[in-house]
């Protein structure tokens, strides 16, 4: 955010500390609050379930309650970044606003509380607060511990000869991946709508981890040839025959959600949002090109040592 530091003011706060939230909201008197803060990694939530619950569930409550205590229920709108992980072991495909929730991780359970407490404050206090049920949103800024970024980083580094291979978990997991920049536009549109409502934010397309991997390598000029199934599946460079991708059971989650596919019809019809502004293929290309440049820089730095 260095390029916009002259346009913003940063305040120190923490979703686990209600006093800091009350202080900041009282100082700023905001028209809109976008709560994008969370412990947002599903796998990590199994390692730190209490922390995930404190931040992802009670953190939402603390923001809403701060607005209520400060008398801002009529002034301040609140957007809560919810998640497709709420659907968990899905009960219908694709998933829409009316699909029942079946959370399947500590992260998803905490996020479900966040979703329902937003709805409760909306109805109990007539607040303009709403949730966007975000399906996987990716970009070149995605954390390196998330699978899409792990893939594009590895593809770039392998293409530059500074990484040997890539290890992944469930190659058959199905996800609805969109570009974060487009999804933020939808968040803003939700907050400009005349009434507070909850919306699914998704592309309406579904792809496997395998397909994302294949396209990321293709963006780096490498064609992957797949052999084997399950834990024995491997991806080889079609030109050289070198093994570049393999499955490691350590990357499987204790409980895995394997079929997420969002239906953005409501956001399209009610808000006029375009979920295909950036296509899936363009998203992978953007991330792959960015991380190839990082790999080139890393290679140059190593050569200079």
Model-found features: residue ranges?
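C-terminal substrate-binding subdomain of Rossmann-fold SDR/epimerase-dehydratase oxidoreductases
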Residues: 13-16, 142-305
